[in-house]
């Protein structure tokens, strides 16, 4: 039979070998296989799912907006400190410095969520930024609708522009912010009072400071604010050579204005109310306001979409990292199991060689078994062919039956084969034969016929 060449060492799996091959190679090959196991699997990095361009775009845009918000917040705080006044709950809306500060702070917080979430790949901050931007747009839309409702509602009761202006007139002396707002409206819109077109200035009779009642102790009794005076009167007085004339003329224009007729005051103060000019101003810019709010949805949608895309990319990248970590754990466990198997092969090889060396040093047993001990033979008496005794009579049926019963009794008293003890020795065999011969001589056991 031709000699068969040994098979080459082939790996059945990355870093593993055939069991028979490893067993035949000895203790050196499994060690080399372990090196293959440890070096076959390299740490692979998952693919990059986060777009660097998108990430840094979101970061830069939100950083710029954050700096703008910081500037607006600083301006509001500066204005509030420069003209510090008592702050009430209504001043949150009426005080421009507080409004500017709140607006700047809101921009800072929202933009901080955006650029910090993009920088740190934080899904929670990115989603907070998108939600805040969307809610801010909803708030802008709601405020715009409120303004449209105020100026296009003619009811004197309830929330309307007429009600707000009357509230400002009644609380002119109690809130400095309201006083400044009313003065700015009357100077810029060239009006005085609220509602009436010809006699709007008479609405100041509802003010605690300017009413004409006998219980009013104020020096401004029956007057109107200085902002109701016409600019032409002040400018004419300012062009005079008398430096005291502008001050005197400004005092004369508003004093006792509520006691005079509109025709007597046309050259000194504005007589029409501020509601109609304010409504006309809003109507002229209503289209621009609506277009601005409508176009504002474009950058809002872009920022929300970009942020959500970035958040999904970060989430998918985390999923890939976790999946790769799980794969690495399974790979390490598999390599550990392979090392254990190879170690067991080494131990098996060492045990096989140790057994072979022990068998080589142990003396070889002889091929011929040792002789059995000699069997002692008891000399057997020869039976006489002819007996000198007289001829025996044939046994009767009763004697034969008694002999059969004794035979059955002796058979039942013997030990069953299943419960028999160890194999009988030669001496016991000889004794049994002698006992059988004695029984045969006494005719208790029938003799076998010789053919």
Curated annotation (Swiss-Prot):
Renumbered ranges of motif Basolateral membrane targeting: 20-24
Keyword Membrane included in the entry's annotation: yes
Residue numbers on the Cytoplasmic membrane side: 1-56, 118-130, 307-451
Tissue-level expression: Expressed in the germline, particularly in sperm cells.
Residues covered by region (Disordered): 328-451
InterPro entries xrefs: Tetraspanin/Peripherin, Tetraspanin_EC2_sf
Main location: membrane
Composition-biased stretches (Pro residues): 366-376
Compositional bias ranges of the Low complexity kind: 410-434
Keyword Transmembrane annotated: yes
Coiled coil: none
Keywords from the named record: Cell membrane, Cytoplasmic vesicle, Endosome, Glycoprotein, Membrane, Transmembrane, Transmembrane helix
GO BP, sorted A to Z: nematode male tail tip morphogenesis; positive regulation of BMP signaling pathway; positive regulation of egg-laying behavior; positive regulation of embryonic development; positive regulation of vulval development; regulation of mesodermal cell fate specification
Glycosylated residues (UniProt): 205, 211
Extracellular side: 78-96, 152-285
Mutant lacking the gene: phenotype: Viable and fertile. No effect on sup-17 localization in embryos. No effect on tsp-12 protein levels or subcellular localization. In a tsp-12 (ok236, ok269 or jj300) mutant background, exhibits vulva morphogenesis defects resulting in vulvaless or protruding vulva phenotype, impaired egg-laying with severe maternal effect embryonic lethality, smaller body size and reduced RAD-SMAD reporter expression, a reporter system for the sma-6/daf-4 BMP-like pathway. Males have severe tail defects including crumpled spicules, fused and shortened sensory rays and smaller fans.
Family: Belongs to the tetraspanin (TM4SF) family.
Functional description taken from the UniProt entry: Functions redundantly with tsp-12 to regulate cell surface levels of the BMP type II receptor daf-4 (but not BMP type I receptor sma-6), probably by regulating endosomal sorting and recycling of receptors, preventing their targeting to degradative lysosomes. Together with tsp-12, regulates cell fate specification in the postembryonic mesodermal M lineage, body size, male development and vulva development, probably by positively modulating BMP-like Sma/Mab signaling. Together with tsp-12 involved in maintaining the structural and functional integrity of the endosomal network.
Name of this protein: Tetraspanin-14
Native source species: Caenorhabditis elegans
Taxonomic lineage of the native organism: Eukaryota, Metazoa, Ecdysozoa, Nematoda, Chromadorea
């Amino acid at each position: 039979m031709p000699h068969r060449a040994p098979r080459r060492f082939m790996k059945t799996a990355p870093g593993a070998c055939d069991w028979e091959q490893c067993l035949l190679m000895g203790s050196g090959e499994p060690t080399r296989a372990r090196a293959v196991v440890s070096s076959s699997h390299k740490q692979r990095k998952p693919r990059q799912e986060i777009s660097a361009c998108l990430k840094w775009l979101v970061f830069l845009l939100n950083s710029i907006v954050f700096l703008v918000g910081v500037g607006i917040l600083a301006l509001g705080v500066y204005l509030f400190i420069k003209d510090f006044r008592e702050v009430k709950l209504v001043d949150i809306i009426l005080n421009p410095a507080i409004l500017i500060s709140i607006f700047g702070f809101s921009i800072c917080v929202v933009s901080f969520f955006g650029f910090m979430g993009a920088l740190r790949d934080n899904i929670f901050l990115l989603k907070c930024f998108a939600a805040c931007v969307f809610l801010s747009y909803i708030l802008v839309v709601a405020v715009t609708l409120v303004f449209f409702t105020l100026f296009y509602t003619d009811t004197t009761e309830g929330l309307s522009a007429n009600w707000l202006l009357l509230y400002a007139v009644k609380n002119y002396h109690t809130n400095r912010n309201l006083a400044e707002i009313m003065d700015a409206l009357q100077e810029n819109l060239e009006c005085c009072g609220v509602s009436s077109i010809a006699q709007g200035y008479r609405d100041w009779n509802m003010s605690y400071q300017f009413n004409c009642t006998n219980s009013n102790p104020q020096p401004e009794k029956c007057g109107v604010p200085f902002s109701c005076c016409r600019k032409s009167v002040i400018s004419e007085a300012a062009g005079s050579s008398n430096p005291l004339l502008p001050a005197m003329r400004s005092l004369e224009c508003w004093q006792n204005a509520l006691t005079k007729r509109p025709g007597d005051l046309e050259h000194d103060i504005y007589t029409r109310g501020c509601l109609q000019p304010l409504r006309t101003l809003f109507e002229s810019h209503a289209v621009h306001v609506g277009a601005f709010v409508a176009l504002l949805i474009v950058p809002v949608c872009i920022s929300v979409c970009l942020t959500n895309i970035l958040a999904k990319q970060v989430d998918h990248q985390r999923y890939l990292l976790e999946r790769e970590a799980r794969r690495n754990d399974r790979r390490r466990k598999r390599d550990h199991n392979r090392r254990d198997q190879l170690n067991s092969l080494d131990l098996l090889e060492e045990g096989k060689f140790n057994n072979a060396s022990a068998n080589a040093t142990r003396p070889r047993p002889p091929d011929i078994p040792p002789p059995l001990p000699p069997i002692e033979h008891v000399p057997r008496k020869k039976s006489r062919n002819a007996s000198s005794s007289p001829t025996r009579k044939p046994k009767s049926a009763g004697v034969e039956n008694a002999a059969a019963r004794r035979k059955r009794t002796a058979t039942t008293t013997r030990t069953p084969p299943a419960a028999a003890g160890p194999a009988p020795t030669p001496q016991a065999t000889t004794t049994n034969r002698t006992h059988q011969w004695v029984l045969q001589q006494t005719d208790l056991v029938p003799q076998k016929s010789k053919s």
